[in-house]
């Protein structure tokens, strides 16, 4: 969902309808859908026709008198393709793009969008209200989104990255050129990012390039920490500045390098796939005592009786480090859908951890928000499920990083206790050969993978009851 702004009710209802009829492997009545969406039966039928136009040819939306509605889709295809198509049509998204990347007056923007000026005003006012939570506002002359430059960029990043299926709205910027530069930075740092983290960083680079080309630079030094020039992440970004200038015609000054260095650090922090100990060496010694203090306090409250080894504590260090850094680039990894899911599924653990964090020194707990609390909740719940279940050949591949992958793995082990064994080797670039070497029988993934000869079950970001049903059938 486009979390930083409201989107049209019709788009929201279409997406909600799609997810609702996909959650369970059964027929739904018009009345059920009407009650769920809180609209008339006639409106439900209209939405079903709209949905039929959006789904791929390989899917089938069956509507039969006396039976109801049933969504038939291949196991290896996800809802994200359809959700992405719907969200890209959002008028509010188009308006935000115009306000960030182009120069307009109210009259010229209304003309572009084929609207009357009077119809455009309330939409602009609603967007202005929505973006205040991102510390931004809309200026009328010229008509643009205004605020700290880094906040404007991260706002657009959140818009784009909440559209599934690797949305790339930059026809004038070759994504492969940016990907090559990020691959180069990975080699310098000897790390590998997960697919989603790399895509997100690519989008931020493209937004930064677009803003720099239109003369918008980060000059509020007091609002952005300047990374030490001897820091590995700063030096890594600095090493590609000449290539950025040659390829895109932009010059990165110290504040711009610091901004991208922090984004790089947050991207790596979200999904470390090389040796965590090696990657965290520079700040692990400083943060580990705090990680142990937090873990001890949470264990005292939850009474899980689990042995918290160094591997577990390393991820606590990772979450703390990310919390301390993210205030300089606010909301970089914020995911409201993820937070809601964790709070609803594990309310006691979430509230307990939130209470423990609030008891820390203000200079520490003030950096934590619901996102970090949710990550810690997922991490502790993963240990709880692993502790109570005996792992038993499935490979889980997700786009969201190590903690998310471990969480999904633990959910599956708990659900199919004794029926499956999760293989925990971390491989970013999966091949048929590597999977056969591990004797993998089934792959469970929330992204499309170019793998043949091994069954793939496509799941949602968090498995639905329908996903669990399909997995059970195949195992």
Curated annotation (Swiss-Prot):
One GO term (biological process):
regulation of DNA-templated transcription
Can you give the residue ranges of the PRD domain? 169-274, 282-390
**Pfam families the UniProt entry points to:** Mga (PF05043), PRD (PF00874)
Domain of life from the UniProt record: Bacteria
Expression is induced as follows: By carbonic acid and CO(2).
PROSITE patterns on file? PRD_2
The stretch of residues making up the signal peptide is none
Question: Which SUPFAM superfamilies would you find in this protein's record?
Answer: PTS-regulatory domain, PRD
Q: Name the keywords, alphabetized.
A: Activator, Capsule biogenesis/degradation, Plasmid, Repeat, Transcription, Transcription regulation, Virulence
Described by its record, this protein's role is as follows:
Acts in trans to stimulate anthrax toxins expression. It activates the transcription of the pagA, cya and lef genes. It also activates capB, a gene required for capsule production.
Entry similarity comment: Belongs to the AtxA/AcpA family.
Protein name according to UniProt? Anthrax toxin expression trans-acting positive regulator
